[in-house]
Amino acid sequence: AWKLLDLVAVAAHQGLPIESIEPRFGYEAQGVNTRAELAQAEAVLRERIRQRWMLAGVTISDPPSVYIDSEVELGQDTVLLPNTHVSGSTRIGRDCEIGPNSIVSNSQIGDRCKITASVVEDSTVEEEVEVGPFSRVRGGAHLERGVYLGTHAEVKNSRLGPGTKSAHFSFIGDADVGANVNIGAGTVTCNYDGVRKNKTTIGEGAFIGSDSMLVAPVEVGARSSTGAGSVVTKDVPSDSTVVGVPARLLPKKRDRSKKE
């Protein structure tokens, strides 16, 4: 194993030019020969990164607990709260609040977003989205403007349209969800049939009742509703309501204001 000072002898032996430089700080010339010295060198690098972003207008609460990779980009007036890790090719917009206890990795976060005690990986989050606490966004998910993802919700490889809400306890996987959809507590898109992943489509303005099971492949039409506890195994037409196990269509109420 080579040590830093060995490089002088190696260069001389190979006839390479040798020059001396004077570092600004002694620790810049510190060797890294043990795991402990590696940790010290990494700590110096992390502190430099944090200082650079704070001088650029990012607020970092409790800096020693916040980790920022060198390739990360942060918008002005964003706040990183304690125990937040931002890694990979991540870009976070302006006026965001990330943390506490959050991980954002290889993701794009728009302006004015809030991510609380949650994990966002390999995903895109547009402007004014709120995630958490205790939620996970992963695997190519795309949350469009104004999406609200509350507590204990997971989104994987899915698109959620503008203004859609999933307040708590849900799994949305391999789904295409339209705008202004309400996804009730306990909803699951049952995407895996034991062999392959299947897609769920939910139209704009739909209302998915609590504890609904959407067994993919399946489509719920625009402005349709599922009753609480429904197991949806067949496509639901637009402007319809289904209930039960398995879910069945309810007859539409006659509009008494219209003459026959």
Predicted regions and their residues:
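Catalytic-core segments of class I nucleotidyltransferases/pyrophosphorylases
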Residues: 1-47, 51
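Residue-level recognition of oxygen-bearing side chains
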Residues: 3, 37, 73, 219, ...
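Fold-independent oxyanion-binding glycine-rich loops
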Residues: 23-24, 35, 62-63, 70-71, ...
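Conserved hydrophobic/aromatic pocket- or pore-lining residues that grip, position, or stack substrates
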Residues: 34, 78-80, 96, 158, ...
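Long, charged amphipathic helices and adjacent flexible linkers at domain junctions
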Residues: 42-71
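Phosphate-binding active sites in nucleotide-utilizing proteins
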Residues: 69-114, 118
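Glycine-rich hexapeptide-repeat left-handed beta-helix
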Residues: 108, 114-260
